[in-house]
Amino acid sequence: MTTNAPGAVILAAGKGTRMKSRLPKVLHPIAGKPMLGHVLSAVSALGSERPVLVVGPGMDEVATYARGLVSGLTIAVQEKQLGTGDAVRAAAPHIDKKESVVLVVFGDTPLVRAETLADMTRRCEEGSDIVVLGFEAADPTGYGRLILDGNDVVRIVEHKDASEEERKNKLCFGGPMAVRAAHLPALLAKLTNKNAQGEFYMTDFVAHGRAAGLVCSAVFCLEADMQGVNSRADLAAAEATMQQRLRMAAMAGGVTMLDPSSVYLSMDTEFGEDVTVGQNVVFGPGCVIANGVTIKAFSHLEGAHVAEGAEIGPFARIRPGSEIGRKARIGNFVETKKARIEDGAKVNHLSYIGDARVGAGANIGAGTITCNYDGYNKFFTDIGAGAFIGSNSSLVAPVSIGDGAYLGSGSVVTKDVAADALGVARARQFEKPGWAAAFHAKHKDKKKASGE
């Protein structure tokens, strides 16, 4: 996106106490992906290979997650929560000396776009020494204000330190900042904590830079892109914004959504063209949906691959490891897990198919269960191509049903059934004429004798 990849500092040392959670704030998910992961992905899209993540003491869980996502990442620890400027100071010794531009972003702003960060970096490359990210807020309460002189940023005033006149200004500072690396040491050295909070503010870079004759400018984005997350309510708002982005992108790519606001996607959900998605469908992580698939209302998919022309739902649950073949059919109240449903196979109602293969063109009757777990281990069920499994059958794994075999309804199968054979595993039906009448008469006489 840019000629030269920037250095990057991600600030993630906040304790997130308002989240009321044992999980670190930046690891709370948005669209199935931790907030910090969204930010790291945006930074990585710019080509930054050695970003620095600033965490607080004891935030090993955050550091471990980030290292697993970005191999070249360095961890810096901010020992005390003394403000954003102090956090950048903690990162400074770890910034690669080769970097010409350093981009500072926040781990709790998961909606920031890589394109916006690229614009900031490009502005630095084109002559600005400091570039801040701003937006116009509908309600600017709580935000730092951008004070402009034409196209130049004069200073950033924190809300608590702003005058009444400055608080009327709706141009706000979003948080991210790009700085020419050569100026960073001097800017850090000039920071003081003479403010209402007694903290070292990164926002003071602008005033100090201006005083030193540096060029300070701004790049602007939508307010929604700068939604920060400090509470569960903020998390819900950010989720709603991200979901709307994902829905719009899916529909632009050829997906029909009958009620878009009720469909929930994950960041890695992949769609082909001419996919139709019904109401209240949820896509967990790891779903790949091919061309022409129909997913009906109230279905839940996770870790699933669905091939061209297949039909899912309504009320289907497709769990991780499921592979649904071309023109296969998974109907209402069917659950699959680690199951390969091959081309044209049908599992139409009320079934559990786990640790199994259902061959091409096979038909699974209502109420069929693959009994795959003995309390300690999982076992595999293999159902051949063209097999017919009668309703209300239990297949006790490990077991194999051959190609073209026919299994009688109500069977409890514990042994393999050969190809093209009929398998019936149930008690033989018998009849006792008059038994029911005698039974009822006997019990009625007992009730009468006891006075009931």
Curated annotation (Swiss-Prot):
Acetyl-CoA binds at residues 366, 372-373, 391, 409, 426. It catalyses: alpha-D-glucosamine 1-phosphate + acetyl-CoA = N-acetyl-alpha-D-glucosamine 1-phosphate + CoA + H(+); N-acetyl-alpha-D-glucosamine 1-phosphate + UTP + H(+) = UDP-N-acetyl-alpha-D-glucosamine + diphosphate. Pathway: Nucleotide-sugar biosynthesis; UDP-N-acetyl-alpha-D-glucosamine biosynthesis; N-acetyl-alpha-D-glucosamine 1-phosphate from alpha-D-glucosamine 6-phosphate (route II): step 2/2; Nucleotide-sugar biosynthesis; UDP-N-acetyl-alpha-D-glucosamine biosynthesis; UDP-N-acetyl-alpha-D-glucosamine from N-acetyl-alpha-D-glucosamine 1-phosphate: step 1/1; Bacterial outer membrane biogenesis; LPS lipid A biosynthesis. Its EC number is 2.7.7.23, 2.3.1.157. GO terms for biological process: cell morphogenesis; cell wall organization; lipid A biosynthetic process; peptidoglycan biosynthetic process; regulation of cell shape; UDP-N-acetylglucosamine biosynthetic process. Disulfide bonds: none annotated. UDP-N-acetyl-alpha-D-glucosamine binds at residues 11-14, 25, 78, 83-84, 144, 158, 230, 319, 337, 352, 363. The keyword Oxidoreductase does not apply. Catalyzes the last two sequential reactions in the de novo biosynthetic pathway for UDP-N-acetylglucosamine (UDP-GlcNAc). The C-terminal domain catalyzes the transfer of acetyl group from acetyl coenzyme A to glucosamine-1-phosphate (GlcN-1-P) to produce N-acetylglucosamine-1-phosphate (GlcNAc-1-P), which is converted into UDP-GlcNAc by the transfer of uridine 5-monophosphate (from uridine 5-triphosphate), a reaction catalyzed by the N-terminal domain. This is Bifunctional protein GlmU. It comes from Parvibaculum lavamentivorans (strain DS-1 / DSM 13023 / NCIMB 13966). The gene is glmU.
